[in-house]
Design a protein with these regions (language model features):
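Phosphate/NTP-binding elements of NTP-utilizing enzymes
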Residues: 1-117
Length: 117
């Protein structure tokens, strides 16, 4: 989060897990605690599965994506990302991961993979 908020402004990032429910359960609580401790402000729009984060005069959007099956790549198609986190990537279809990687076309974008379990 610090990397995204200090290197980019007005960009879009992806936070991905097998399901959006698992993302909200496993990733977002710790991330919110970290953001609060760092002085970041987050406004979540749960109905549209994203949050806008502000820090030091910068603002970026973080979309939530679930990669549970072969239909999931269509959910992330078409968006231009400056970075993406794939939680439990080993549980996601390869086609979803490939689409997420392909979406990271902003100069300097990065990928993070967690292969647990």
């Amino acid at each position: 989060m610090t990397w995204a908020m200090t290197n980019f402004d007005e960009c879009i990032f992806g936070l991905c897990s097998k399901t959006i429910v698992s993302l909200k359960r496993n990733i977002l609580p710790a991330l919110r605690g970290y953001m609060k401790a760092m002085g970041m402000t987050a406004v979540e729009v749960a109905s549209k599965n994203y949050m806008d984060v502000s820090f030091c005069g910068r603002k970026n959007r973080f979309y939530y994506f679930g990669g549970r099956d072969e239909g999931s790549p269509s959910l992330i198609q078409g968006v231009t990302l400056a970075g993406v986190l794939l939680d439990e990537a080993a549980l996601m279809p390869r086609s979803f991961i490939e689409q997420a990687v392909a979406r990271c076309s902003v100069a300097g974008s990065k990928l993070w993979f967690n292969c647990n379990p």
